[in-house]
Amino acid sequence: MQKEPMSQFGYDKLAAELKDLKDNQRPAVVIEIDTARSHGDLKENAEYHAAREKQALIESRIVELSDLLARAQVIDPSSYEHDSVKFGSSVVIMDLDTEKESKYTLVGICEGDLDKGYISIASPIARAMLGKKEGDDFKVRLPKGESEFEILSINYEPLKF
């Protein structure tokens, strides 16, 4: 079973969503199904079919979240040195073609927020820079083609969700 690294915030966020699905949304959709069923013929009952579809989506998400939480590896990135790129590292990189600098922080798969510069540790660019040190170059295949980057700095900054 492959572990999924995430922060405590990410774990708590997923656990809260799972609790809401089980405690609120699942019982509510059962009531919706019962109400729709009481309206008669199920073959042509759009309300019933919509509620059943909603139930299937909720059950699917419950299974997905349960699996993810079972595989979660909660990591405190402040507890270790960031001398190389790891989960929780804030990394400044430079595109060697354009000389454009970008800053990214590597977070769990459910914590990405590009507006804040938080990228999933499972993303191609994050995977390519894992384990690299300041001054190292790395290549990554992006939608626009292969690009080469240099790591300018690595440090730890507390996550601000």
From Swiss-Prot:
GO terms for molecular function: DNA binding; RNA polymerase binding. It holds the Pfam family GreA_GreB_N. The gene is greA. HAMAP family: GreA_GreB (MF_00105). This is Transcription elongation factor GreA. InterPro entries: GreA/GreB_C_sf, TF_GreA/GreB_CS, Tscrpt_elong_fac_GreA, Tscrpt_elong_fac_GreA/B, Tscrpt_elong_fac_GreA/B_C, Tscrpt_elong_fac_GreA/B_fam, Tscrpt_elong_fac_GreA/B_N, Tscrpt_elong_fac_GreA/B_N_sf. The keyword Glycoprotein does not apply. Transmembrane segments: none annotated. Necessary for efficient RNA polymerase transcription elongation past template-encoded arresting sites. The arresting sites in DNA have the property of trapping a certain fraction of elongating RNA polymerases that pass through, resulting in locked ternary complexes. Cleavage of the nascent transcript by cleavage factors such as GreA or GreB allows the resumption of elongation from the new 3'terminus. GreA releases sequences of 2 to 3 nucleotides. The keyword Nuclease does not apply. It comes from the Bacteria. Keywords: DNA-binding, Transcription, Transcription regulation. GO terms for biological process: DNA-templated transcription elongation; regulation of DNA-templated transcription elongation. The lineage of its organism: Bacteria, Pseudomonadati, Campylobacterota, Epsilonproteobacteria, Campylobacterales. Belongs to the GreA/GreB family.
